[in-house]
């Protein structure tokens, strides 16, 4: 029965007519309004219930994931500094899931590198202890004992004599044993350049979603570190066994060329060039001045206090380091000098072809990412993504040919010890990629990068090491998600 609105009427009005006018027409409006109100109320109630239930499910899933997170820590002991990486991961259907977003990944770098403690191994404990404390602040205390921590040293440490390496590693092992993390002495080690290249290749192709597919459609990596350079990719030609590694992903096997060119990292190569200049009679004016075409004009310095900062000079060269360097600032001459250095020993090549020295290198093919100092130098010059090698030549010529005083005015926030190196690095990059490895100046298949993929995953070899060192079953990853489930 419809609800009626009833009014008390004056005595002189006719109740039937008044009742008719008040009840019948307005009952439809009232009924419609009330019905709409009821429907709206029900809709709002159902909506709120849905939101609350959805949020509850999401909260529960998030809470369960956080409570079931596993953690792993890797310390990258590089030549210029030591960086700690803290990873969080979880399991789905019994398989680990890796996510390198900010919620599950953190890192911190401290300088100098562990190799700088060659004369004082105990000094290495200070930076490692600070890094360990950083990791502890990002992992629940109750999970420290179950979280593994590994230290992997690279080219800077590889350059040291083995006894010195072990002295430094023993100091770090002592710190890690008492850290509260899960640790074994063999987890602090000096890794090979080949392993470093493989790790970088893994994380790059994980980020790009190309793992599990055609090996020849994967992306290669060329890295320019401080002490070494790495070239890693899947070639189409036969590779001598000493230069190849095979890894399996799901049902796909990848035969990878990976080689580390020790002493050809940016810092080591610059010091090596200085050594060559010192030994060259033609480069010296005979009055204790050595001309350096890879340093901008107007920059004169004592080689021992300025150039030996990376610690890569030999003892014989350090003796000569009291010579004064006369900056010549000539990109073309610098390019020629660095190319001669890269080609030294090529006459002893025992393989089909050698691109750098007497080391076998397959013909470069497919897509590549140029990382580390390739990226840093390109960003410094503000190069575009296309034909950046051609742009590098122009930028290098301008920079090398500029007076030092003007460069300091143009780049006031860049420290001198870094600023003057961009002349060398621009010429060295061209000598390595174009003149030695044969990459065309207009080849758009090679790009400089520090991150890759839609999720901008850092192209850091330590991330690849984390993936490969995590105990994982065979993968069913389909290449479409940034989450990589199971790699072995």
Swiss-Prot record:
What does the UniProt entry say about where the protein is found?
Membrane
Residue intervals passing through the bilayer: 33-53
Bias regions of kind Polar residues — which residues? Answer: 10-21
Q: Which Pfam families match?
A: GDA1_CD39 (PF01150)
Q: Its principal location?
A: membrane
Attached carbohydrates are found at 251
The prosthetic group or cofactor this protein requires is: Ca(2+)
Residue ranges of region Disordered?
A: 1-26
For this protein, what is the EC number? Answer: 3.6.1.5
Membrane topology term: Single-pass type II membrane protein
Role according to the record: Catalyzes the hydrolysis of phosphoanhydride bonds of nucleoside tri- and di-phosphates.
Q: What is this protein called?
A: Probable apyrase 5
Where does this protein come from, organism-wise? Arabidopsis thaliana (Mouse-ear cress)
Protein's gene: APY5
């Amino acid at each position: 029965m419809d609800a009626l609105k009833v009014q008390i009427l004056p005595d002189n009005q006719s109740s039937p007519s008044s009742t008719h006018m008040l009840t019948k027409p307005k009952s439809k409006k009232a009924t419609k309004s009330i019905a709409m109100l009821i429907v709206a109320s029900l809709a709002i109630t159902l909506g709120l219930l849905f939101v609350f239930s959805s949020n509850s499910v999401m909260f529960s899933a998030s809470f369960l994931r956080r409570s079931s997170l596993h953690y792993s820590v890797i310390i990258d002991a590089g030549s210029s500094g030591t960086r700690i990486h803290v990873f969080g991961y979880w399991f789905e259907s019994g398989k680990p899931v890796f996510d390198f977003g900010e919620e599950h990944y953190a890192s911190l770098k401290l300088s100098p590198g562990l190799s700088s403690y060659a004369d004082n191994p105990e000094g290495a404990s200070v930076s490692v202890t600070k890094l360990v404390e950083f990791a502890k602040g990002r992992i629940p205390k109750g999970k420290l004992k179950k979280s593994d921590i590994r230290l992997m040293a690279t080219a800077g440490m590889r350059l040291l004599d083995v006894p010195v390496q072990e002295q430094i590693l023993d100091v770090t092992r002592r710190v890690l044993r008492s850290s509260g993390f899960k640790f074994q002495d063999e987890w602090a080690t000096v890794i090979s350049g080949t392993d470093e290249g493989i790790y970088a290749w893994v994380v790059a192709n994980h980020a790009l979603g190309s793992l599990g597919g055609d090996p020849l459609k994967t992306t290669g990596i060329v890295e320019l570190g401080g002490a070494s350079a790495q070239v890693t990719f899947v070639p189409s030609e036969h590779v001598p066994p000493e230069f190849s590694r095979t890894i399996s992903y799901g049902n796909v096997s990848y035969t990878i060329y990976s080689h580390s060119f020790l002493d050809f990292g940016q810092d080591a190569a610059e010091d090596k060039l200085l050594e060559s200049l010192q030994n060259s009679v033609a480069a010296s004016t005979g009055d204790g001045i050595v001309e350096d075409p890879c340093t901008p004009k107007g920059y004169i310095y004592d080689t021992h206090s300025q150039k030996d900062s990376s610690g890569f000079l030999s003892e014989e060269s350090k003796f000569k380091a009291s010579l004064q360097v006369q900056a010549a600032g000539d990109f073309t001459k610098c390019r020629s000098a660095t190319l001669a250095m890269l080609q030294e020993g090529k006459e002893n090549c025992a393989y089909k072809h050698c691109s750098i020295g007497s080391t076998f290198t397959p013909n470069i093919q497919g897509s590549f990412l140029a990382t580390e100092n390739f990226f840093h130098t390109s960003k410094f010059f503000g190069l575009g993504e296309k034909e950046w090698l051609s742009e590098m030549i122009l930028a290098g010529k301008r920079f090398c040919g500029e007076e030092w005083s003007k460069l300091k005015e143009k780049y006031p926030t860049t420290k001198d010890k870094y600023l003057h190196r961009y002349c060398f690095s621009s010429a060295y990059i061209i000598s390595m990629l174009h003149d030695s490895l044969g990459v065309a100046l207009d080849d758009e298949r090679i790009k400089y990068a520090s991150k890759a993929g839609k999720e901008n995953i850092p192209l850091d070899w330590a991330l690849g090491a984390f993936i490969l060192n995590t105990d994982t079953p065979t993968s069913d990853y389909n290449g479409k998600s940034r989450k990589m489930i199971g790699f072995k």
